Amino acid sequence: MVLLTNKNDGKTEATLADLAAAIVDATDGVPAGLQALRLALQQRGFVQAAAVYARLKQQHPELYLAEDYINNWGYSLLRQGQKQPALELFKLNVQLYPASANTYDSLAEVYEATGDGDSAIQNYRRSLLLNPTNTNATEHLQKLVAAGTKSNGN
């Protein structure tokens, strides 16, 4: 499958990624465990995402959530303005993949988007411990620290 666009912005790319995911789901089907997880989170909300996942994993041992799948799902929710559900998915991703710098970087980004600078800084720092070459974390961390310094100095 090839999707093309004449626009080169993050929103168009994200929309195409969401469209591609929907096409793959429609073509290949969605595993029962993943269907159950999506339904449970829609019905109960995302606040207990980790607990819901753990319970459904017992009922559906085949349920597997890849790191990039959760990350893409979280960013999709974030693009839709659903910050709290995105936050809960990124927390789940950190829980499932604690050795991944990317999971902490993504969690930091959603904390930053919700205005929780302290948690963003903490998670960017954790990401940098795991991957010292993470330029995204370095740039965001510098901005957050500078903003905090300015606001503390006023």
Task: Enumerate the predicted regions with their spans.
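Canonical positions in the second alpha-helix
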Residues: L56, N93, R126-S127
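Catalytic loop of the DD-peptidase/beta-lactamase superfamily, centered on the K-T-G motif
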Residues: M1-Q48
